[in-house]
Amino acid sequence: SIAGLLQPKAGQVTILGKSTGVARNIGVLFQRGALFSSLTVQENIALPIIELLGISRKKANQIAAVKIALTGLPAQAGELYPADLSGGMIKRAALARALALDPEILFLDEPTAGLDPIGAADFDRLLMTLRDAFHLTVFLITHDLDTLYTACDRVAVLSQKKVLVVDTLDVVAATQDEWIKEYFHGPRGRAAALSAAKA
């Protein structure tokens, strides 16, 4: 509902002061990329540019090439189909498509899922670089504690079908809810916090 893909069951979602008509202002990266298998990477990125902005295919392909470069993919990746890509390349291609319309807000669903620790750390750094360079608001869903500690300014914890807390990571981690304590202070949580403290 937040990204505008589903209607809310109750109430309304307001983004940038509007409840509708913000599709051009947001980019979405789906957990598994959701690239069209019959289109090349370049065509996947150019598609929303052509459809939503009415730009010519030639110009859209030029813009797509820039987005490909921004995400660290080699230029020749634009001519590949999703089936030809590694998991990390799919994430970057999907991120390039999410950036296609120069959004103000990026919605990312499990952006580091399926990546090895080195690839996930590289992706986190890429997200932070893009966020800072383009003044993006990044809204992400993740279970990756390293990503939380590396890339998040504020955290909302959802458990038992409700929001338990929304605050900075330090405040969230200190919350006295049993589930939160287990999540943030278990072995993986402690390792992620230690790693973040060393960085």
Description of each model-found segment:
Residues 3:
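Helix-to-loop junction immediately C-terminal to a conserved catalytic motif
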Residues 81-85, 89:
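Conserved ABC ATPase signature
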Residues 11-22:
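Conserved ABC transporter NBD signature motif
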Residues 106-109:
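Catalytic Walker B motif of ABC-type/P-loop ATPase nucleotide-binding domains
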Residues 58-76:
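Conserved ABC ATPase "signature" region
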Residues 100-104:
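A short, proline-enriched helix->beta-strand linker immediately N-terminal to the Walker B motif
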